Amino acid sequence: MTTTTTLDLTGLKCPLPALKTRKALGRIKPGERLEVRCTDPLAAIDIPHLVGETGDRIESVTREGDGLVFLIERRIVLEDRQGQ
Protein backbone atom coordinates (compact mmCIF):
# COMPACT_ATOMS: atom_id res chain seq x y z
CA MET A 1 0.00 0.00 0.00
CA THR A 2 1.33 3.43 -0.97
CA THR A 3 1.47 6.06 1.74
CA THR A 4 -0.14 9.40 0.87
CA THR A 5 0.54 12.52 2.92
CA THR A 6 -1.86 15.46 2.60
CA LEU A 7 -0.60 19.03 2.60
CA ASP A 8 -3.38 21.63 2.96
CA LEU A 9 -2.13 24.96 1.64
CA THR A 10 -5.57 26.50 1.23
CA GLY A 11 -5.42 30.28 1.51
CA LEU A 12 -1.65 30.59 1.09
CA LYS A 13 -0.32 32.82 -1.69
CA CYS A 14 2.73 32.58 -3.95
CA PRO A 15 5.48 31.65 -3.24
CA LEU A 16 4.40 29.72 -0.12
CA PRO A 17 2.59 26.81 -1.83
CA ALA A 18 5.66 25.93 -3.91
CA LEU A 19 8.08 26.40 -1.01
CA LYS A 20 6.02 24.28 1.38
CA THR A 21 5.50 21.62 -1.29
CA ARG A 22 9.28 21.40 -1.87
CA LYS A 23 9.87 21.01 1.87
CA ALA A 24 7.17 18.34 2.20
CA LEU A 25 8.58 16.37 -0.77
CA GLY A 26 11.91 16.30 1.05
CA ARG A 27 10.26 14.60 4.02
CA ILE A 28 8.65 11.67 2.19
CA LYS A 29 10.30 8.57 0.74
CA PRO A 30 10.53 7.58 -2.92
CA GLY A 31 7.35 5.75 -3.93
CA GLU A 32 5.21 7.68 -1.46
CA ARG A 33 2.73 10.30 -2.60
CA LEU A 34 1.99 13.86 -1.56
CA GLU A 35 -1.49 15.32 -1.99
CA VAL A 36 -1.28 19.11 -2.18
CA ARG A 37 -4.46 21.17 -1.78
CA CYS A 38 -4.20 24.85 -2.68
CA THR A 39 -6.28 27.83 -3.77
CA ASP A 40 -3.56 30.11 -5.16
CA PRO A 41 -4.11 30.40 -8.95
CA LEU A 42 -0.35 30.60 -9.54
CA ALA A 43 0.05 27.11 -8.07
CA ALA A 44 -1.21 25.78 -11.42
CA ILE A 45 2.12 26.98 -12.85
CA ASP A 46 4.43 26.83 -9.83
CA ILE A 47 3.74 23.28 -8.59
CA PRO A 48 4.26 21.56 -11.99
CA HIS A 49 7.45 23.62 -12.48
CA LEU A 50 8.71 22.55 -9.04
CA VAL A 51 7.93 18.89 -9.73
CA GLY A 52 9.85 19.13 -13.00
CA GLU A 53 12.86 20.48 -11.10
CA THR A 54 12.78 17.79 -8.41
CA GLY A 55 12.34 14.86 -10.82
CA ASP A 56 9.14 13.72 -9.15
CA ARG A 57 5.89 12.99 -11.03
CA ILE A 58 2.42 14.54 -10.96
CA GLU A 59 -0.06 11.66 -11.02
CA SER A 60 -3.13 13.88 -11.24
CA VAL A 61 -4.44 17.42 -10.94
CA THR A 62 -8.10 17.94 -10.10
CA ARG A 63 -10.24 20.97 -9.48
CA GLU A 64 -12.14 21.01 -6.18
CA GLY A 65 -14.27 24.04 -5.45
CA ASP A 66 -12.09 27.12 -5.83
CA GLY A 67 -8.82 25.22 -5.63
CA LEU A 68 -6.61 22.53 -7.09
CA VAL A 69 -5.52 19.16 -5.75
CA PHE A 70 -2.18 17.79 -6.97
CA LEU A 71 -1.22 14.17 -6.38
CA ILE A 72 2.57 13.91 -6.62
CA GLU A 73 4.65 10.73 -6.52
CA ARG A 74 8.07 11.07 -4.92
CA ARG A 75 10.57 9.53 -7.32
CA ILE A 76 14.09 10.37 -6.14
CA VAL A 77 15.83 12.04 -3.24
CA LEU A 78 16.94 15.64 -3.98
CA GLU A 79 20.48 15.03 -2.71
CA ASP A 80 20.89 12.07 -5.12
CA ARG A 81 19.75 14.19 -8.07
CA GLN A 82 22.23 16.96 -7.27
CA GLY A 83 25.13 14.55 -7.73
CA GLN A 84 24.07 13.61 -11.27
List the predicted regions and their residue ranges.
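Short, compositionally biased "basic patch" segments
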Residues: 1-2, 73
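C-terminal structural segments of small proteins and small subunits
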Residues: 48-84
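Right-handed parallel beta-helix/beta-solenoid
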Residues: 2-8
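Conserved beta-strand core positions
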Residues: 5, 34, 68-70
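Amphipathic, hydrophobic secondary-structure cores in small proteins
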Residues: 9-61
